[in-house]
């Protein structure tokens, strides 16, 4: 390649390939809560395959495992923070006096 064309070539940037989220030794099972909880959002939703960087088969197995764990109440359907906020909303408050000071009637 001559010198005039070399000016337009971009240098390739190096990048570090991310490690796969599931190693070969990990078992995708409803009892493996530490593994399953990595694929659930803070709202308690199952994260998409694109976000998780999983294969189709792995995503299917993770989804089934999460659903089984929820049914067997190993995982909550909703995270605890939301339940706490809801309970706080309906909490009864103390009644306050409507009058500011003592008022007397003028006769």
Swiss-Prot record:
It comes from the Eukaryota. GO terms for biological process: translation. One of its GO terms (cellular component) is mitochondrial small ribosomal subunit. The keyword RNA-binding applies. Residues 85-107 are annotated as: Disordered. Keywords: Chloroplast, Plastid, Ribonucleoprotein, Ribosomal protein, RNA-binding, rRNA-binding. GO terms for molecular function: small ribosomal subunit rRNA binding; structural constituent of ribosome. InterPro entries: Ribosomal_bS18, Ribosomal_bS18_sf. It is found in: Plastid, Chloroplast. Residues 85-95 have a biased composition (Basic residues). Belongs to the bacterial ribosomal protein bS18 family. Part of the 30S ribosomal subunit. PANTHER family: 30S RIBOSOMAL PROTEIN S18 (PTHR13479), SMALL RIBOSOMAL SUBUNIT PROTEIN BS18M (PTHR13479:SF40). This is Small ribosomal subunit protein bS18c.
